[in-house]
């Protein structure tokens, strides 16, 4: 698939078929994502793969908003960053997560990013319990790892509506002479 086509086709999809994603497909997608650039080539990002439906259901309950759909994904990948490797672990993890979304598209998988880091479990209690702490209660995430996001992966027959027109020219700014 050409890069431009991949950019055009990649969409956040929240509806998945019950068909499991083959381990070989997941492994390929994950390895491609980890080939993404990182600050000072630190490779500070780690990917935690969850395919157990009961564990995925628990992950889906990490927030009372925007994460329930995860329960129907055949695979969820937690994108983690080693906070001891670099102070840019969030940026590195975001680059890897973006590469993961495009690698999934290339493999014929649907995907959707759900942010974890700095997000409360309850939307109306921003200073309350945090989604990241909730996940640490039942997942073996090392203390030195921060969890940036969860990415749902799966096959889907859902066809999202066409993207609305967007004038990229209004977001490109050239310095004045």
Regions flagged by a language model, labelled:
Residues 1-177:
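Acidic, surface-exposed loops and disordered segments
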């Amino acid at each position: 698939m050409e890069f431009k086509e991949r950019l055009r086709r990649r969409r956040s999809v929240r509806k998945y078929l019950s068909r499991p994603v083959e381990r070989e497909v997941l492994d390929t997608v994950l390895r491609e994502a980890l080939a993404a650039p990182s600050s000072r080539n630190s490779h500070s990002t780690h990917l935690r793969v969850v395919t157990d439906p009961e564990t995925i259901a628990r992950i889906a309950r990490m927030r009372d908003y925007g994460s329930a759909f995860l329960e129907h994904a055949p695979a969820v990948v937690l994108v983690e960053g080693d906070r001891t490797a670099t102070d840019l672990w969030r940026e590195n993890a975001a680059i890897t997560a973006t590469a993961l979304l495009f690698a999934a598209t290339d493999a014929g998988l649907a995907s959707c990013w759900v942010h974890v880091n700095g997000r409360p479990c309850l939307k109306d209690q921003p200073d309350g319990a945090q989604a990241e702490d909730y996940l640490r209660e039942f997942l073996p995430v090392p203390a030195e790892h921060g969890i940036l996001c969860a990415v749902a992966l799966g096959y889907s027959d859902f066809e999202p509506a066409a993207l609305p027109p967007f004038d990229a020219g209004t977001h490109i700014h050239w310095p004045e002479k």
